Regions:
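Extended substrate-binding grooves/exosites of carbohydrate-active enzymes
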Residues: 1-213
Length: 213
């Protein structure tokens, strides 16, 4: 299965998923974690789009654009309300649009974990980078929704240890629906060291100044 984080992909990709039998979570182009994720603090009062009326039209427009373009692809089984935009009424209204327009597919949104005011935005419990024990705590507490680990095991180089502890949950808990790896691609650029030997360089290897994040 594939999550098209964090926006719809080019149409050819869905054709290939249809042909080869991949399940798809099609994700709307909504991403605003820069408005509320600050160093050492979370500021929900800065959240966009939340329930701000001036954003509702844009939120629904992006949902419509995705659904109308992609609705005939059988590989798509879930619509996603976007990525890391906290929560709020506008995203809930987006989820309701998906259900009214297409009641054959489920709706996903990870942000309900952070903002329970509109818990019905998502048809499944979803989190990013949860620890194994945190997932088990949820699954052992009479869950009313299946758990989808929508983003996890992000790694650079050889730092990706312990993945088996997550995959083992799939056989242990019927309500655990697996997860989506971020992001199965080399995060570096091939370059050469001073001896002419090639290596994959990551951030900080180019004499660049790291950002706050």
């Amino acid at each position: 299965a594939v999550r098209t984080s964090h926006y719809p992909n080019q149409s050819l990709w869905y054709d290939l998923c249809d042909e080869y039998g991949l399940y798809v979570i099609d994700e709307a182009n909504i991403e605003s974690h820069g408005t509320w994720q600050k160093i050492g603090e979370v500021r929900p009062d800065h959240v966009v789009p939340d329930g701000k009326s001036e954003w509702l039209g844009t939120v629904i427009d992006r949902a419509k654009s995705m659904v109308e373009r992609d609705k005939n692809h059988p590989s798509i089984i879930i619509w996603s309300c976007g990525n890391e935009s906290y929560g709020g009424e506008n995203l809930y209204k987006m989820s309701e649009y998906f259900r009214e327009r297409d009641n054959t597919r489920l709706v996903h949104y990870e942000g309900i974990f952070r903002d329970r005011r509109f818990n019905d935005t998502s048809d499944m419990e979803s989190r990013m980078y949860a620890k194994v024990y945190e997932i088990e705590e949820y699954l052992n507490n009479n869950p009313d929704k299946p758990f989808v680990h929508c983003e996890y095991t992000h790694a650079m180089g050889n730092s990706n240890g312990g993945m088996h502890k997550y995959t083992e949950l799939e056989n242990k808990y019927p309500m655990y629906q697996g997860g989506f790896i971020w992001d199965y691609i080399d995060q570096g650029i091939m370059t050469k060291d001073r001896y002419g030997k090639e290596y994959l360089a990551f951030g900080g290897d180019f004499g660049d100044r790291p950002t706050d994040y």
